[in-house]
């Protein structure tokens, strides 16, 4: 179709169906290194439309988009992402991603062999990511809006700390990461349901890795966005810590770099021996007995550090300390000294209160 006053310019075009088989797309980063390879077994586009004049940005739409068996090799070969199926329906404003996996390309034992520095080995799976009430355009510019985002995930992170940590820059915080997305987005309601997160680390060759995890994880947020014109994102998180302790935390992620991030919450109650895996791996200490009544905390933080308070209410805490050169043998004198210090602190401060 052509406008009568601009006969030389293409106004719109519509293609009823486009089908692609075995697509490969390669993306190079700013250093001219291959950053990602994406393979699609099949891509189907129905009702594809372009509506544009030279005076305006290119605007394109489609009625439905489906893809199967998507594979993305990324992160410099450390991980592969697969999506079994993706489908977008414009009339329903609905995007559904099925069976999303993040697969490490090397085993836990092989990761240190391929990388001479500390690298997170990530394994993840989501049954589905579902965007409802999805629109892609706002006043001729791309702005992704959704009424609701529903998802679940299982996430395992492993870090071998035997290798040196060669990171020389400060870790980016959530708002900075979100603002790196090329497309602005706003989700009215974010719901993460019945998910799982575990972190495991190996500190010494002669020690077993330590592990902590959070089950029955739920995350809720309203107006979740990467639009820096907004003040912040607020996330409410609940979970079971080590399958035993009830946990509730609220996070505030500001977009203004002059405002600090905030976190506050509590964990109640569980046996402190549940922490033995991570304690022995990190500091060669195991809890012999003792229960946590309540752990509450509130702190502000940024890239450089945190400041806040923690209250640790516990009962009957006794520990064993182990010898560095023989991690399976109890260091008797060190154990006596630590337990005596715990008793003294309990007399001075019935609930251990301190600064973060």
Q: Residue ranges of each PLM-predicted region?
A:
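Short, T/G/N/S-enriched strand-turn elements that build extracellular solenoid repeat scaffolds
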Residues: 140-141
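Short, surface-exposed beta-strand-loop junctions and turns on beta-sheet-rich folds
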Residues: 103-104, 205-207, 255, 314-316
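Extended amphipathic, helix-rich lipid-handling scaffolds
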Residues: 1-27, 43-48, 63-70, 94-136, ...
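Hydrophobic residues positioned within well-ordered beta-strands of beta-sheet architectures
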Residues: 127, 235-237, 249, 263, ...
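Extended terminal
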Residues: 252-254, 266, 277, 283-356
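Elongated, acidic membrane-bridging lipid-handling scaffolds
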Residues: 1-93, 171-261
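Outer-membrane beta-barrel proteins
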Residues: 107, 158-160, 319-323
């Amino acid at each position: 179709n052509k406008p009568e006053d601009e006969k030389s310019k293409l106004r719109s075009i519509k293609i009823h169906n486009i089908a692609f088989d075995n697509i490969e797309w390669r993306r190079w980063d700013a250093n001219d290194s291959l950053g990602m390879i994406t393979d699609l077994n099949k891509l189907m586009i129905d009702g594809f439309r372009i509506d544009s004049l030279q005076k305006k940005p290119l605007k394109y739409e489609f009625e439905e988009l489906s893809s199967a068996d998507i594979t993305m090799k990324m992160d410099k070969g450390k991980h592969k992402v697969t999506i079994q199926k993706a489908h977008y329906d414009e009339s329903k404003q609905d995007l559904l991603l099925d069976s999303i996996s993040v697969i490490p390309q090397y085993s836990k034992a092989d990761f240190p062999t391929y990388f001479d520095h500390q690298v997170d080995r990530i394994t993840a799976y989501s049954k589905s990511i579902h965007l409802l009430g999805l629109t892609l355009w706002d006043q001729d510019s791309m702005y992704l809006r959704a009424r609701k985002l529903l998802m679940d995930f299982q996430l395992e992170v492993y870090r071998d700390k035997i290798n040196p940590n060669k990171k020389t820059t400060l870790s980016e915080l959530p708002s900075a990461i979100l603002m790196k997305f090329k497309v602005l987005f706003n989700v009215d309601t974010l719901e993460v349901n019945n998910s799982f997160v575990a972190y495991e680390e190996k500190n010494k060759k002669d020690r077993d890795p330590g592990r902590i995890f959070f089950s029955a994880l739920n995350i809720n947020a309203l107006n979740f966005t990467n639009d820096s014109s907004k003040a912040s994102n607020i996330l409410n998180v609940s979970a079971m810590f080590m399958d035993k302790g009830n946990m509730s935390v609220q996070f505030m992620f500001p977009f203004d770099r002059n405002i600090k991030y905030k976190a506050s919450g509590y964990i109640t109650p569980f046996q402190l021996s549940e922490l033995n895996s991570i304690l022995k791996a990190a500091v060669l200490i195991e809890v012999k007995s003792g229960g946590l009544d309540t752990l509450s905390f509130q702190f502000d933080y940024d890239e450089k550090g945190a400041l806040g308070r923690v209250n640790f209410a516990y009962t009957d805490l006794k520990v064993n300390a182990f010898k560095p050169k023989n991690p399976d043998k109890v260091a008797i004198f060190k154990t006596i000294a630590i337990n005596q210090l715990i008793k003294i602190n309990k007399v001075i401060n019935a609930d251990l209160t301190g600064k973060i």
